Amino acid sequence: MNAPAKFSTSQIRSDFLAFFEGRGHTIVPSAPLVPGNDPTLLFTNSGMVQFKDVFLGAEKRSYVRAADVQRCLRAGGKHNDLDSVGYTARHHTFFEMLGNWSFGDYFKKDAIAWAWELLTQIWKLPTDRLLVTVYHTDEEAFALWRDMIGIPESRIVRIGDNKGAPYASDNFWQMADTGPCGPCTEIFFDHGDHIAGGPPGSPDEDGDRFIEIWNLVFMQFDRQPDGTLVPLPAPCVDTGMGLERLAAILQHVHTNYEIDLFQALIGKASALTGITDLENKSLRVIADHIRACSFLIVDGVLPSNEGRGYVLRRIIRRALRHGWMLGVRQPFFSKMVPTLVELMGEAYPELVVAKDTVARALLAEEERFAETLDAGMKIFDEVASRSQDIIPGADAFRLYDTYGFPVDLTADIARERGMRVDMEGFECAMERQRETARAAGKFGGGVALPADLVASMSPTVFLGYEAYDADALRVVALLKQGRPVERAQAGDEVIVFTDRTPFYAESGGQVGDSGQLNGPGVLIEVADTQKFAGQFHGHVGRISEGTLALGDVLAGGIDVQRRGKTILNHSATHLLHAALREVLGTHVQQKGSLVAPDRLRFDFSHFQPITADELAVIERKVNAEVRTNHGVEVHNMAMQEALDFGAMALFGEKYGENVRVLKMGGYSTELCGGTHVTRTGDIGLFKITSEGGVSSGVRRIEAVTGQGALDYVADEERRLLEAAHLLGGNATEVVDKVRALTERQKRLQRELESLKAKLASGATADLGAAAIDVAGVKVVAVRLEGFDAKALRDAMDRLKQQLGDSVIVLAGASGGKVALVSGVNGSPTGKVKAGELLSNIASQIGGKGGGRPDLAQGGGEDGPALATALDGVPLWVKQHLG
């Protein structure tokens, strides 16, 4: 079969969506690779992920028929194809899944009929090359294929429970141990008897002859805890068809890497690496990985050392290592992005929008890994040369910890050489590091509530959104020295739990409130408020008067001024987050924060330092929102309603069914349980005080607001005026005067270097004349006042040219310290080693040094011992010359 030219990969996407749109389906955009509704899932790995809540009955959509092309990733967690990518015909990290869905609307008859129509009438697949499977008890599906479609029974394969349990089958799908489930029917394409492999269900089914094209899942049961199946009132259809596999069939090629999309990417990789063999496995890896990496960055993931960011880093570094194998030593991977945009930008406009961000992020990671890749490969070669067939876990960990080699990258390299990694040893080394980190992170005073106490308490009712003080607060628990007690007295350090409180407990980056609790004859100074077991507010403080007992009723009031300063900073972090995403890109995600009375600290994902111009724009945008004086709206709503409302949720955070949404005009909408201003104008002024890196892929901004910002600006102005005074001008002249001063300093430095060179030249002439002859070798060992290491090396070079066969030791003394340089030139090089000579001298003056046989340097302390050490050089040389 010669496939018509119209069946390009992009045309297949369009055909699929147009076909189902014409049959009443709503076309739904692809969900991001980062699931927004399932914290248990690392990446979107199938088409049904974005519809999971619909199938579970937790969400309703405005349509009952849908079709989409979903981008998917399988490179981490349970579903991980990374190790196979590049080495097999059909494994990918990133792939596209074509799917059509029915939510209680059509069922088996229409799903089967439409699938067959699209494959055989639109895409013209020969019917005698197709066969299907059904679950062994699904008589309805079997009959539809035989009677409605007309497939001979010989090409309808019944698949039973082949995974060791009832309903555990390749042809029975279930979301979990309980809940929606049902049989599925799969459509296979026969590549022909020239390809090894048997039909599904046969002993040879894993061969490449019969390839699954389309899986139609019929969710018609609700599985109960006891394993019984109860029919669903509204059965659903969930289908999935891999675009790359289908394209291979429609383009009459056997492997996915031969389709038009991959051939274009492989061609670009070939041009960048100079490798002309288009079947080279490394080119395939690079072509596959550029899709996964680019779309992860599009969806807000950046390279880091944890979670999704680390999966991205692993994929990037695997691609870079394959480039290194091909001899590439310069950045190349980021140069693949324009070709990818040409190929997939029409289908995914978000890729076009983010293309510059993607390229910059990849380039930054290329430059970072290039610093250690060569060194790491040398270490691997050394380890491999002394190992038989196993790379020790400790060495794999060293490659990971010191050289940035993800362990699966090390395993990849080992596999290519017929070796494997001792994963147990690697995990032991990792666990030792985790234990060290945990020990370093512990601090005194950490308290955990006993389980029985937690069970007896109700969550604390927080009153602090509306009130700064409250009464009738009943003491429900009391801790002293970390243990529950019934009473405590004046002088005791305690943690007091009340049924209600106006005190905010530290969470979401916002520090806890301080203040006072008081009752008849008792006063507690509250220094901090912490959240215990995620739901109990513990007032941490000291009883300054009286005795406190369980059941006592107290009044409490927070430090209003401290809270007031804190809320300015908290609201400012929301505006800052929005401004960062507007200026730097939507890849920016919050990674941590501190909201205190005196400052705010905001950590976020970004792959490079922020320029001064970018910082200025960010600060200006935040202050513009402050001046606009938006009202701050608070809404309590269901999680899905909040997301539909436009609220931004933080990746990795766990949210309940109902959430609190904070909206500042049209600029910022986030989920937040903290305390905030009522209008953005209350913030007054926002001023960034610093920006820097925290870890790989994470930046940090610190800032101040309100009176703190005014004080900061006033202090900066004072320092500017002081600098102007010292420079003899006014504030507007500081930059010009500093520039002139810097140029003068550079000129004087050049003049000084010139004078030093002349001094060294004169000293060299004198030293050459004073050289001592030791067995035909000229020996010089002298002290030179004021010479630094560079001047000593210059003098050394001149002396070597002047003296020929020689051994030279020069000591430059300045400020109580000595710089040492030793050199060996000509015939004595084999017997006298400069490094050994310098080490001998340095050890006598309390220093150290070393180097090559012909040149070494070091240092030590100035003093009488230096003269003695230098005087002994001729004898040392004589002894070594023999």
Curated annotation (Swiss-Prot):
<comment type="function">
    <text>Catalyzes the attachment of alanine to tRNA(Ala) in a two-step reaction: alanine is first activated by ATP to form Ala-AMP and then transferred to the acceptor end of tRNA(Ala). Also edits incorrectly charged Ser-tRNA(Ala) and Gly-tRNA(Ala) via its editing domain.</text>
</comment>
<protein>
    <recommendedName>
        <fullName>Alanine--tRNA ligase</fullName>
        <ecNumber>6.1.1.7</ecNumber>
    </recommendedName>
</protein>
<dbReference type="InterPro" id="IPR045864">
    <property type="entry name" value="aa-tRNA-synth_II/BPL/LPL"/>
</dbReference>
<keyword id="KW-0694">RNA-binding</keyword>
<feature type="binding site">
    <location>
        <position position="672"/>
    </location>
    <ligand>
        <name>Zn(2+)</name>
    </ligand>
</feature>
<keyword id="KW-0479">Metal-binding</keyword>
<dbReference type="GO" id="GO:0002161">
    <property type="term" value="F:aminoacyl-tRNA deacylase activity"/>
</dbReference>
<dbReference type="GO" id="GO:0045892">
    <property type="term" value="P:negative regulation of DNA-templated transcription"/>
</dbReference>
<feature type="binding site">
    <location>
        <position position="574"/>
    </location>
    <ligand>
        <name>Zn(2+)</name>
    </ligand>
</feature>
<dbReference type="InterPro" id="IPR018162">
    <property type="entry name" value="Ala-tRNA-ligase_IIc_anticod-bd"/>
</dbReference>
<comment type="similarity">
    <text>Belongs to the class-II aminoacyl-tRNA synthetase family.</text>
</comment>
<dbReference type="Pfam" id="PF01411">
    <property type="entry name" value="tRNA-synt_2c"/>
</dbReference>
<keyword id="KW-0436">Ligase</keyword>
<dbReference type="InterPro" id="IPR002318">
    <property type="entry name" value="Ala-tRNA-lgiase_IIc"/>
</dbReference>
<dbReference type="InterPro" id="IPR018165">
    <property type="entry name" value="Ala-tRNA-synth_IIc_core"/>
</dbReference>
<dbReference type="InterPro" id="IPR003156">
    <property type="entry name" value="DHHA1_dom"/>
</dbReference>
<dbReference type="Pfam" id="PF02272">
    <property type="entry name" value="DHHA1"/>
</dbReference>
<dbReference type="InterPro" id="IPR018163">
    <property type="entry name" value="Thr/Ala-tRNA-synth_IIc_edit"/>
</dbReference>
<dbReference type="GO" id="GO:0005829">
    <property type="term" value="C:cytosol"/>
</dbReference>
<dbReference type="InterPro" id="IPR012947">
    <property type="entry name" value="tRNA_SAD"/>
</dbReference>
<dbReference type="InterPro" id="IPR050058">
    <property type="entry name" value="Ala-tRNA_ligase"/>
</dbReference>
<keyword id="KW-0862">Zinc</keyword>
<keyword id="KW-0648">Protein biosynthesis</keyword>
<keyword id="KW-0963">Cytoplasm</keyword>
<dbReference type="InterPro" id="IPR023033">
    <property type="entry name" value="Ala_tRNA_ligase_euk/bac"/>
</dbReference>
<feature type="binding site">
    <location>
        <position position="676"/>
    </location>
    <ligand>
        <name>Zn(2+)</name>
    </ligand>
</feature>
<dbReference type="GO" id="GO:0005524">
    <property type="term" value="F:ATP binding"/>
</dbReference>
<dbReference type="InterPro" id="IPR009000">
    <property type="entry name" value="Transl_B-barrel_sf"/>
</dbReference>
<dbReference type="InterPro" id="IPR018164">
    <property type="entry name" value="Ala-tRNA-synth_IIc_N"/>
</dbReference>
<dbReference type="GO" id="GO:0004813">
    <property type="term" value="F:alanine-tRNA ligase activity"/>
</dbReference>
<keyword id="KW-0547">Nucleotide-binding</keyword>
<dbReference type="GO" id="GO:0006419">
    <property type="term" value="P:alanyl-tRNA aminoacylation"/>
</dbReference>
<dbReference type="Pfam" id="PF07973">
    <property type="entry name" value="tRNA_SAD"/>
</dbReference>
<keyword id="KW-0030">Aminoacyl-tRNA synthetase</keyword>
<keyword id="KW-0820">tRNA-binding</keyword>
<keyword id="KW-0067">ATP-binding</keyword>
<dbReference type="GO" id="GO:0000049">
    <property type="term" value="F:tRNA binding"/>
</dbReference>
<dbReference type="GO" id="GO:0008270">
    <property type="term" value="F:zinc ion binding"/>
</dbReference>
<feature type="binding site">
    <location>
        <position position="570"/>
    </location>
    <ligand>
        <name>Zn(2+)</name>
    </ligand>
</feature>
